């Protein structure tokens, strides 16, 4: 990713954190990750992250989804003899469409199908203040709601 692209997305993410009322230290502001998984399609498959802690068992992050961005489908697998991580999504700003293993049909979702393989369509809609926890080894993907921006 070009430095110019990285800096552009960091600025957008910091603006979103501010709109969401999330106070960040200077160290945190300088540690924003811009994630595109090497796909070079950040406007569609990507997100911006501030990581507060990330160990083998626990992780705490604030994630920004900008207009049009989707976090690709994945699961948290066992690592080093430990089961995969639980993950709790708490919507802080905007709306988040979370798709997890369970009943659901791709023709019935409120979001849009990203240009990558997705196989789970059980839809959980999160509004500010709402949260949902998934267990280890649960397939999931997520994207911002109708205004196409979200902080989770």
PLM regions: where:
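Glycine- and acidic-residue-biased ligand/ion/polar-headgroup-sensing regions
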Residues: 66-67, 84-105
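Double-stranded beta-helix
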Residues: 98-127
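Asparagine-centered strand-capping/turn motif at beta-strand->loop junctions
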Residues: 142-146
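A short beta-loop-beta micro-motif enriched in histidine and acidic residues
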Residues: 50-60, 71-91, 119
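Histidine-centered metal-chelating micro-motifs
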Residues: 70-72, 78-79, 121, 128-141
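A short, N-terminal "cap"/entry segment at the start of jelly-roll beta-barrel domains
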Residues: 1-59, 114-116
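Conserved small/polar residues in nucleotide/adenosyl-binding loops
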Residues: 151-152
């Amino acid at each position: 990713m070009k430095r110019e692209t990285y800096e552009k997305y960091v600025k957008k993410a910091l603006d979103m954190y501010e709109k969401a009322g999330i106070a960040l230290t200077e160290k945190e502001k300088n540690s924003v990750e811009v994630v595109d998984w090497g796909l070079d399609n950040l406007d569609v498959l990507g997100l911006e992250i501030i990581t507060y802690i990330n160990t083998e068992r626990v992780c705490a992050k604030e994630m920004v989804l900008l207009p049009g961005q989707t976090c690709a489908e994945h699961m948290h697998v066992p690592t080093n003899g430990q089961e995969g991580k639980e993950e709790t999504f708490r919507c802080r700003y905007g709306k988040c469409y979370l798709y997890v293993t369970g009943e659901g049909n791709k023709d019935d979702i409120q979001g849009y199908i990203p240009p990558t393989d997705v196989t789970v369509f059980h839809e959980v809609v999160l509004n500010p203040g709402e949260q949902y926890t998934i267990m280890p080894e649960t397939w999931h993907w997520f994207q911002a709601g109708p205004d196409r921006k979200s902080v989770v």
